[in-house]
């Protein structure tokens, strides 16, 4: 993981005697270089005016950020929509859900020259997946709701970064991939892949279209609630700003991910920034993942105790 510190000066707030200065609040935030988190750098920068010391820590996978947050190494993290249910089912009670991040249609990306006109066309195909990833949960839940046996195709498990899935598709090692941005758009732009638009797996009742969540460490939320509220408020403000301007969103995507402007512009036209997930959706996920055998027990009855929507509510009114 990579660490980026943003140190902000603290203006006099008039809360203490003349000449006194408050100690700056500090937050450690885990994130990934993915397009739907484009507001995060600017949100951290905005906290300079509030005197907050923000350390941004980069992770490749949601799962790694989840582990760090549960261990107490992070105050806030971007994680997958399923990660609250996963944590609770495995006995970890240190995560509190705060808000969703964004949504988009999710298409199977087929290799150019292969046929994916309907879900029936996945039969016998080799499809690369990232096992346990947020998009895998979306895909698997969709198959269940459509009554499609998981063994009707050959699942090729690919670990690591999304570039590995694109490489497998480009080399012809698989017929299709189930992945996330920017690794969905890159094959399309480069010509070796296409969106199988009849195979949208973002609309399952169990998982839905949410791309991720912001969560807090439970102890950190109790100890640093004011600072975490300030971060959520800054994030929502930037989310609204970028969501209202595709050009600004595209620029922010490039700044965060290093993507070429062409790729960033395409992605900005696909993703809708803003919270989609709700506690009820997380409950449905928990039930579905238990049925899938992915988590050891159904924790849908525990979700409300580990979700705090009040910070988002306050941020949306700011």
Where would I find each of the regions flagged by the language model?
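Secondary-structure end/capping motifs
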Residues: 221-296
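N-terminal export signals
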Residues: 5-22
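Short polybasic/polar patches that bind polyanions
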Residues: 48, 144, 188, 255, ...
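Short, glycine-/small- and polar/acidic-enriched structural segments
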Residues: 22-159, 168, 175-181, 197-198, ...
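Short, solvent-exposed loop/beta-turn-alpha elements that line the ligand-binding surface or hinge
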Residues: 49, 200-207, 272-278
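Conserved C-terminal helix/tail region of periplasmic/extracytoplasmic solute-binding proteins
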Residues: 290-318
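Pocket-lining segment of extracytoplasmic ligand-binding domains
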Residues: 82, 161-252
């Amino acid at each position: 993981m990579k660490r980026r510190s943003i140190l902000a000066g603290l203006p006099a707030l008039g809360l203490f005697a003349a000449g006194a200065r408050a100690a700056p609040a500090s937050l450690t935030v885990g994130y990934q270089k993915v397009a739907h988190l484009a507001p995060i750098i600017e949100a951290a920068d905005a906290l300079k005016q509030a005197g907050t010391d923000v350390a941004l820590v980069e992770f490749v996978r949601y799962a790694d950020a989840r582990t760090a947050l549960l261990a107490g190494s992070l105050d806030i993290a971007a994680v997958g929509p399923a990660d609250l249910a996963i944590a609770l089912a495995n006995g970890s009670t240190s995560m509190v859900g705060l808000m969703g991040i964004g949504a988009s249609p999710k298409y199977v990306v087929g290799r150019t020259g292969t046929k994916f006109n309907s879900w029936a066309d996945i039969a016998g195909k080799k499809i690369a997946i990232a096992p346990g990833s947020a998009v895998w949960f979306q895909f698997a839940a969709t198959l269940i709701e459509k009554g499609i046996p998981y063994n009707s195709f050959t699942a090729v498990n690919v670990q690591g970064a999304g570039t590995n899935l694109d490489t497998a598709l480009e080399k012809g090692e698989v017929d299709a991939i189930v992945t996330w941005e920017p690794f969905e758009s890159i094959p399309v732009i480069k010509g070796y892949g296409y969106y199988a638009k009849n195979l949208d797996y973002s609309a399952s009742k169990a998982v839905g279209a949410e791309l991720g969540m912001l969560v807090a460490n439970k102890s950190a939320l109790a100890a640093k609630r004011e600072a975490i509220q300030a971060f959520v408020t800054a994030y929502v403000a930037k989310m609204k700003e970028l969501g209202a301007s595709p050009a600004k969103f595209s620029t922010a995507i490039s700044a965060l991910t290093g993507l070429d402007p062409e790729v960033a512009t395409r992605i900005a036209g696909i993703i809708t920034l803003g919270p989609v997930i709700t506690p009820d959706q997380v409950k449905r996920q928990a039930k579905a993942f238990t049925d899938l055998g992915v988590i050891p027990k159904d924790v849908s009855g525990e979700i409300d105790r580990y979700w705090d929507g009040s910070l988002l509510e306050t941020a949306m009114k700011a």
